Amino acid sequence: MKGKEQQMAINIAILGFGTVGSGVAETLDINKELITKRVGEEINVKYILDIRDFPESKFANLVTHNADEVFDSDILIAVETIGGARIAYEYTKRALSLGISVVTSNKELVSTHGPELIKIAQENNCYYLFEAAVGGGIPIIRPLYKCLAANKITKIAGIVNGTTNYILSQMKDEGIDFDTALKQAQANGFAEANPSADIDGIDAQRKISILSTIANDGAYIAPDQISAEGISAITNDDFEFASSIGCDIKLIALYEAGEDKPVVYVAPTLVAKSNLLFNVSGVFNAIMVEGNSLGQAMFYGQGAGTLPTASAVCGDILEAAMSNPTENRTWTEESVAITPYDEIAADIVVRADVPAKIITAAEGYECEVLSDEAILVKGIRHKDIASLVSETGAKSWMHYLK
């Protein structure tokens, strides 16, 4: 990290003063004394870079519109909370190339350009840190890298998108349809005006890309390899069916180490009541991690919001300020192959009027009768599901998580 030994305070710049950026400034301000004590030096916000002015903000005097003013200064850490993968990419690359550590909550940028940006950070003896990119305020990136470093991570299953979990919770609890629940989410500030990244599973796809790459020892798994199915086709009838077999419906992002290649996908899933993810409702996130020594552990908390996300960002600021940048983890530059979606062996629940037909047609697979119209079929390859459904006249099927 450039010039740290020459400064009495650690100067930082916040790039983008929206929901998360403003939360970072607020968190650093209200916890200033505590943070200084823990770091041993003051964390000083020197600049806030944004195209807008914020005359009502107590940080208004720190705002600049000039990127050159920021990057030509003595800042040691840049907080990238711009979002997207264009301007944020340019600024992040510029900062890292100058030896300025970057911390971010930008899952799109991390999932698409992570290998390149981590490499640039290593080459310039600085950090690229992204705890807040997955799970908002939930600690998950650092635990995977550090606390669970002695484990082979065999499985990750998570509810990693608060918008979709809120919508599904409202559909179940209030008995309303998808469109009404989406409008409620937008009215309450839990969904964007254009919610496609959330409801189509793209946001979850990016997040499981990051978690999978870390679990896969830095062998990069690009988001565009990962099959992602959203929630817009879920109906109230689906929830009635789920309830009848003791399940709830969640949008699950899944990683499994696999015997040959990793298994990674995002899909609406019937979650059994015995699973800890069953009780995760509203905008909350939860991530189940399974390690070969650990067994199972669940990380739970607020997956979005100004201060929860800012909390994770500020944790990275402190790590960049106190740690040795040689601890950077490497990601491979090229994406590694994962199991093709059609070849994935999954547990599914098939809904049919005549369960016996399913059992007969699914010969060779382990089956379990869950109700008069529900059959659990274990380990069936995705490419075989369509023929099973069409041959038996089944109504529908969905992934199952016990």
Language-model features: locations:
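Catalytic, metal-anchored helix/loop core of enzyme active sites in primary metabolism
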Residues: I153-A157, N165-L168, K172, Q184, ...
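Substrate-binding/catalytic subdomain of NAD(P)-dependent oxidoreductase enzymes
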Residues: T180-N279, F284-A286
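NAD(P)-binding Rossmann-fold cofactor-contacting core
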Residues: I30-S57
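Glycine-rich Rossmann-fold phosphate-binding loop(s) that bind the pyrophosphate
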Residues: F17
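N-terminal Rossmann-fold NAD(P) dinucleotide-binding loop
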Residues: G21
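Rossmann-fold NAD(P)-binding glycine/threonine-rich loop
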Residues: Y89-R94, K107-V134, I141-L144
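A conserved regulatory-domain signal marking ACT and ACT-like small-molecule sensing domains
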Residues: I317-E319, S323-K402
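Rossmann-fold NAD(P) dinucleotide-binding segment
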Residues: A67-S105
